[in-house]
């Protein structure tokens, strides 16, 4: 299968702390890394953010998700977010770039 994107949507009063906490946990060698990670703010809903993670494959994403580093990252981020996180798990079917 092709590329895979996971979007994690969440609410926070301190996005800088969320980003700092996420970046404080390195991904060890041997664990698949996202090809890109983008943090975005929802202009229509103050305090709502999403992290967009792109992987080479679904399998890479699942191996990354199962890693101890990811569990540690989630433990650091969770107290900085409010309510439930929403996950979007997306297979890339087509992409056009300019």
What are these regions (language model features)?
Residues 1-68, 80-98:
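Short S/T/G/P-rich N-terminal loop/turn motif that feeds into the first structured element of a domain
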Residues 71-76:
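Low-complexity, intrinsically disordered Gly/Pro/Thr-rich segments
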